[in-house]
């Protein structure tokens, strides 16, 4: 959310489960599409079927973040998120916090394909990262 806010991209956060609240998840997906959602981001640990379930209910881009909890520290979530059947893709990022940050940047990049102002904000952010890195040396 912080990354999206930095790009002035609106977002909706909802806690739902592919296993425990499947009907509510489907309804949320349908409602947010009607409201103009362009990209979905899901984070789940362990069996981690949330992002795949979202992808099953929309043709919009879905970004999956494997949660870093559980006895395998997110490795099980990574495999569950990345191993999708042909034709139902989920763009999977790194496990945990780093993945969450990159999911925000990736969502912004997807949206920027049709938004020159957003594309400039992303380019400016990259330049700022470069400046900070070079300054710290």
Model-derived features: where do they sit?
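Short, solvent-exposed amphipathic alpha-helical segments in soluble enzyme
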Residues: 1-6, 30, 57-59, 108-109
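Short, ordered loop/turn segments at secondary-structure junctions
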Residues: 16-18, 45-46, 67-70, 95-98
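Structural motif
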Residues: 19-30
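Glycine-rich phosphate-binding loop
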Residues: 28-70
């Amino acid at each position: 959310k912080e990354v999206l806010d930095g790009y002035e991209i609106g977002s909706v956060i909802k806690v739902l489960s592919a296993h425990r609240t499947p009907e509510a998840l489907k309804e949320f997906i349908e409602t947010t599409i009607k409201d103009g959602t362009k990209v979905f981001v899901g984070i789940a640990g362990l069996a981690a079927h949330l992002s795949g379930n979202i992808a099953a209910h929309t043709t919009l881009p879905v970004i999956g973040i494997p949660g870093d909890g559980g006895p395998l520290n997110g490795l099980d979530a990574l495999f569950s998120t990345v191993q999708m059947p042909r034709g139902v893709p989920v763009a999977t990022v790194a496990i945990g916090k780093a993945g969450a940050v990159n999911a925000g940047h990736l969502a912004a990049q997807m949206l920027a394909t049709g938004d020159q102002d957003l594309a400039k904000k992303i380019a400016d952010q990259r330049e700022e990262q470069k400046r900070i890195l070079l300054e710290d040396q």
